[in-house]
Regions:
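Activation-segment/catalytic-loop signature of the eukaryotic protein kinase fold
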Residues: 39
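Conserved short submotifs of the Hanks-type protein kinase catalytic core
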Residues: 44-57
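C-terminal regulatory tails of eukaryotic serine/threonine kinases
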Residues: 223-315
C-alpha cells in the first residue's frame, strides 16, 4: 500500500503529478508493472493499493563490489523484463520518462516490475509535442536536455544506461553536479567493444549498449520500433512469450539468490510523517478538503473492469 499525505503533496506542488500518475495507473494493467487495484482516502491521506512487490528496488540489488555484479544471462533476463514493460506502456500511448533502477521493483519470483508514473506522459505522435525537462540526472536522454521533442525512443536511452550500470556497477555519464552530468550525456562518447568490455561479457552486449546510447533519437536502437530492440543479436535467445507469462524460473538463473544476498540493502523509505505536525497544517488541510481537490481519488479495479462502453457496471450472471 502506498500512503500519500495530502498536505505534503500540496506543499511540494505535486498535485498535478499525482493526478496524472493516478489517471495513468487506471489505464494500465500488465504482469510486469506495479498495478493499481484500489484507492481510497481519509481526511489526511490517499491510499493506493498496488501489487505486492517485496523484493526491493533494482537499485538496492546493484552491489558496490564489482565481483558481485550480475552475470550476463541474469542481466539479459532482467532487461527483457524491462523491455516488455516498456512495450506494454508504449502500446498504451505512455512514455515513462523516468526509467532508472529505483523505479524497478522485484516481485517474490524474481521478476522486475516498472513503477512510478509520476512524470509519465500520454503521447500521440500525430498531435503531441513534449519538450519539458523531466527525469533523473544520469538517466535522461540528450533530446530531453536540449528540449527537443520527446517520444517513446527517449525511454530507450535510459534502458541503455541501466544495462551499462548492471555490467560495470556505475553509470556511463557521471559528474559532480547536474550540469556536469548533462554535459557528459551530451558530449561524452561511449563506445564499447570486446577489448574494453567487462570480462566474461560478449561483444553483442557491447553493441547493444552502443546502439541504445546513440545521442540522436532517430539513430538510437528502437527508433524503428521496440521489435528492433527485441530482435538484437544479444537477445536472440530470449523466449519473450515465456517471460511474459512468467514461465521462466528466475530462481534457476540465480536471481532469487541475489535478492536474498542483498536483502539487507532494501531500505524502506518512510514518508515524511505529517501526522505529528498536522496541527500546523490544519488550515491547509481544511482548504484541501473544502475545495475537494482529491475528490476523484477513488478507484476499484474490479468495478472498472466490469464497466460497459457507457461506463455502467454490469454483473456476470450464470446462464
Amino acid at each position: 500500500m502506498k500512503e500519500i499525505s495530502k498536505v505534503k503533496t500540496f506543499l511540494e506542488g505535486n498535485i498535478e503529478s499525482l493526478i496524472s500518475e493516478f489517471n495513468i495507473l487506471k489505464k494500465l494493467h500488465y504482469i510486469l508493472i506495479s498495478n493499481l487495484y484500489f484507492s481510497y482516502q481519509d481526511n489526511e491521506y490517499i491510499f493506493l493499493i498496488l501489487d505486492y512487490l517485496p523484493g526491493g528496488t533494482l537499485r538496492n540489488q546493484i552491489p558496490d563490489t564489482p565481483s558481485l555484479i550480475f552475470s550476463e544471462n541474469q542481466i539479459k533476463f532482467l532487461i527483457s523484463n524491462i523491455i516488455l514493460s516498456l512495450e506494454y506502456i508504449h502500446n498504451q500511448g505512455i512514455i515513462h520518462r523516468d526509467l532508472k533502477p529505483e523505479n524497478l521493483l522485484f516481485d517474490n519470483e524474481g521478476y522486475l516490475h516498472l513503477t512510478d508514473f509520476g512524470i509519465s506522459k500520454i503521447y500521440n505522435s500525430e498531435n503531441t509535442k513534449i519538450f519539458d525537462i523531466s527525469g533523473t540526472p544520469g538517466y535522461i536522454s540528450p533530446e530531453i536536455i536540449k528540449r527537443e521533442p520527446q517520444n517513446f525512443v527517449s525511454d530507450f536511452f535510459g534502458l541503455g544506461i541501466i544495462v551499462y550500470e548492471l555490467i560495470f556497477g556505475k553509470r556511463p555519464f557521471e559528474g559532480k553536479n547536474k550540469d556536469e552530468i548533462a554535459e557528459n550525456i551530451l558530449n561524452k562518447k561511449i563506445y564499447l567493444n570486446e577489448k574494453n568490455m567487462k570480462k566474461n561479457f560478449s561483444g553483442d552486449a557491447a553493441d547493444f549498449i552502443n546502439k541504445l546510447l546513440q545521442k540522436k533519437n532517430k539513430q538510437r536502437l528502437g527508433s524503428r520500433g521496440i521489435d528492433e530492440i527485441k530482435s538484437h543479436k544479444w537477445l536472440e535467445d530470449i523466449d519473450w512469450i515465456s517471460i511474459e507469462y512468467k514461465n521462466i524460473d528466475a530462481g534457476n538463473l540465480g536471481i532469487l539468490d541475489i535478492l536474498k544476498r542483498n536483502r539487507n540493502n532494501n531500505k524502506i523509505l518512510e514518508d515524511f510523517n505529517f501526522k505529528s505536525k498536522i496541527d500546523k497544517y490544519n488550515n491547509i488541510l481544511n482548504k484541501i478538503n473544502k475545495e475537494n481537490i482529491f475528490k476523484n481519488f477513488f478507484y476499484n479495479y474490479i468495478d472498472d473492469k466490469n464497466k460497459d462502453d457507457n461506463g455502467n457496471i454490469f454483473s456476470i450472471k450464470d446462464e
